[in-house]
A protein has these predicted regions:
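Acidic/His metal-coordination segments adjacent to aromatic residues that form catalytic metal sites
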Residues: 1, 54-72, 130
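Aromatic-rich carbohydrate-recognition surfaces in CAZymes
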Residues: 1-52, 72-80
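Residue-level detector of functional hotspots within protein domains
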Residues: 3, 10-12, 65, 108-109, ...
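Active-site-adjacent bridging/hinge elements
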Residues: 7, 11, 52-61, 119-121, ...
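Active-site core of glycosidic bond-cleaving carbohydrate-active enzymes
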Residues: 28-39, 66, 70-105, 116-120, ...
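Short loop/turn segments at secondary-structure transitions that flank enzyme active sites
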Residues: 47, 59, 153-154
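Short amphipathic coiled-coil heptad-repeat segments
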Residues: 110-115
Length: 183
């Protein structure tokens, strides 16, 4: 079975729109969508309440990618940003921001305690839910750029993680013919 769960992507795009056009009328109109999305994410992808979210085909690079219920960095980062901005939107439209601010803070704490590998300077791809509950340290590129894009890191973490990419992820050599020779 192959399909995508693009709720995270749609809501992330919607939140970026809100950052550039915080029209209170539109925020109010879309509030139920955001609220129901965050409830759905919590119910389906964080059923144990540890503030670390599972992921199933929820990013563009994720053809048949599933973590078997584990705690996944990229989906957790998206949910951090979703809750953080939901708290800000709630304040603007007169709703209670506390549940969203509390969840965002708990997500960030859980990410730092469980998924951040301090001695290597990057996030783990995920942590197993079952069995030995191993931390999978071989992170994909999206595991680095998503927390940075979502603001789920300190400036030092962002720097260290991008340095880890430079030093550890393989590169595909590309040679291009140009008027001055092969580049």
């Amino acid at each position: 079975m192959h399909h995508y769960d693009m709720n995270l992507n749609y809501i992330d795009e919607l939140l970026w729109h809100f950052c550039y056009d915080a029209d209170p009328a539109y925020l109010r109109k879309m509030w139920p969508v955001l609220k129901l999305h965050l409830e759905w994410e919590k119910r389906n992808w964080d059923p144990d309440g540890d503030h670390l979210y599972d992921a199933y085909c929820c990013i563009w690079a994720s053809d048949a990618l599933y973590y078997n219920g584990g705690a996944v960095t990229h989906s957790t980062a998206y949910n951090y940003r979703g809750n953080l901005l939901a708290a800000r939107i709630a304040e603007i439209i007169g709703e209670d921001p506390k549940p969203y601010a509390n969840e965002a803070a708990a997500i960030l704490k859980a990410m730092n305690e469980t998924l951040w590998i301090d001695d290597e300077g990057h996030w783990a791809e995920y942590k197993d839910l079952m069995g030995l509950k191993r931390l999978h340290k071989n992170a994909a590129l999206w595991t680095i750029y998503t927390p940075i894009d979502c603001g789920a890191c300190s400036p030092e973490q962002a720097y260290r993680a991008t340095r880890w990419v430079d030093e550890n992820l393989p590169r595909i050599p590309i040679k291009v013919a140009s008027p001055t020779g092969v580049v």
